[in-house]
């Protein structure tokens, strides 16, 4: 048998996948720490007991209790809610439903969350970037100049990793610019820490607005992998065409429904209040720490700070088992590290370690 035209497995793969640099998640980056402040998780576990023990049947595609509970919590109709394997799947579903590979583009504004880029690249969709302004707000002129051929614009508010809200008037301008041209995805993964800023009330006005949500942050369920897409019914119906038939396992749906009960939502709000209190403690302490140049305002469960020698600080804390998130490679974030708000004990360990750093 001739082997002249034999291809390796790598050769058989799509070119864009061969060239793809996968998203560097906190777990993928590894580390042997005992203080994990690099993934914006809630620092302590929340206990649940499974009430659904029947696992020999496939689950519902969109579990009724989860959809109805989330709709009530978010103040939208059940028909405007889709549940998925984390908000990350929601990102991918929107790109798959609206973007033609090799023809259409997505647009995002770095520094921001990395999965918009990775999801588009995986699917073979062009990625356009319009860097944020110096104050990390939207460059509306730059976005307007790049809308031809753009089908989806991603905006993270509050933005990860910078922590600030996007100006609501700028968001409204963006929605007017894109009306009839592109979908605007507002990533509200951290909205529970600033609920007054949600865009859910705008859905009736903007049929091309899509909102992403998650149970990973304030609901303390990062390990559950459960996210939500909020949009008008026409958009939801399109996303339902491309979602997997059984995106949520029965145990995930069971726990999600419990987390979204009135008691679960009250517990979440207590966690938010606790986190905001700890965030202020951490901010105050960082501002009085010699190796810290600047602490940026945050509306989230993490803090971005600029350090005099961020790389050595990052490694020093890593070696002490304190794992932070290095942001040096992000545009305009030279010298910056992101610190998840932990427990008081964890936060104090960070401060003590930073104050021991040479200046």
UniProtKB/Swiss-Prot annotation:
Instruction: Give the GO terms filed under biological process for this record.
Output: L-histidine biosynthetic process
Coiled coil segments of this chain: none
**What keywords sit in the KW lines?**
Amino-acid biosynthesis, Aminotransferase, Histidine biosynthesis, Pyridoxal phosphate, Transferase
* Keyword presence, Methyltransferase: no
Pfam families in the cross-refs? Aminotran_1_2 (PF00155)
Q: Which InterPro entries match?
A: Aminotrans_II_pyridoxalP_BS, Aminotransferase_I/II_large, HisP_aminotrans, PyrdxlP-dep_Trfase, PyrdxlP-dep_Trfase_major, PyrdxlP-dep_Trfase_small
Single GO molecular function:
histidinol-phosphate transaminase activity
Cite the annotated pathway.
Amino-acid biosynthesis; L-histidine biosynthesis; L-histidine from 5-phospho-alpha-D-ribose 1-diphosphate: step 7/9
Q: Which residues carry this modification: N6-(pyridoxal phosphate)lysine?
A: 217
Q: What reaction gets catalysed by this protein?
A: L-histidinol phosphate + 2-oxoglutarate = 3-(imidazol-4-yl)-2-oxopropyl phosphate + L-glutamate
Q: How does it assemble?
A: Homodimer.
Give the UniProt family note: Belongs to the class-II pyridoxal-phosphate-dependent aminotransferase family. Histidinol-phosphate aminotransferase subfamily.
Q: What is this protein called?
A: Histidinol-phosphate aminotransferase
Gene encoding this chain? Answer: hisC
